Amino acid sequence: PYRRQRQMCIRDRWSANLYLSMSYFFAAKGYEGFASWMKAQAHEESDHADVLAQYVMKRGGQAKVGAVDAVPQEWASPLDVFEHVYKHECHVSELIDKLVDVASAEKDKASQDFLWGFVREQVEEEATVQGILDKIKLGGDVALYHLDIQLGARK
C-alpha cells in the first residue's frame, strides 16, 4: 500500500544525487557558493527521503532502499544548471501532487496531511529557484559573482 511513497523515497535519493552532482560541477568551476548551496539542497533531499521512509514505517509499512539511476554530470553554464533545477523542482511538485490525489481518493487523511507539508515546501522551492534564475538572466556575469557569494551564506 505504500509503494508510491517508497518510489518517492527513491526519487528523493535521486534528487539528492543530482544536487550533489551539481555541487561538484560548481566546485570544479570555482563557484564555491553555488557548490555549497547545491550541497545543502542534496542534504535536504536526503532528509526528505528519510522523512518519507519514517512515515511509511509509522503507518505499518516497510521502508525499502531501491536502486537509484545515474544523474547528469555536466551542464553548459550556471544558467543551464538552474534551468535544470527549476524543471526538476516542477516535476517533483507534480509527483507530490499525484501522491496527494491518491491519498485523497483513498480517503487517507493522515497521508494527505503529511503530504501537504511537502506541497507547501515545493511552492517555496520553485519560487527560490525562479528568483535565482531571474537574477542570473537579468545580471549576467556580475549577478553570478554576487549570487555565488549570497548562496554560499546558506547553512
Task: Identify the function of each model-found stretch.
Residues F26-K29, E106, G139:
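Residue-level signal for short amphipathic helical patches enriched in basic/charged
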Residues G131-K155:
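Structured surface interface patches that mediate subunit assembly and partner/cofactor docking
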Residues A27-A67, V129-I132:
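Conserved alpha-helical segments that form or flank metal/cofactor-binding pockets of metalloenzymes
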Residues A35, K39-A42, S46, Y86, ...:
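Generic structural concept
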Residues P1-R6, I10:
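Single conserved hydrophobic/aromatic residue that forms the stacking wall/gate
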Residues R11, S15, Y19-M22, Q54-Y55, ...:
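Acidic/histidine-rich alpha-helical segments that form the ligand environment
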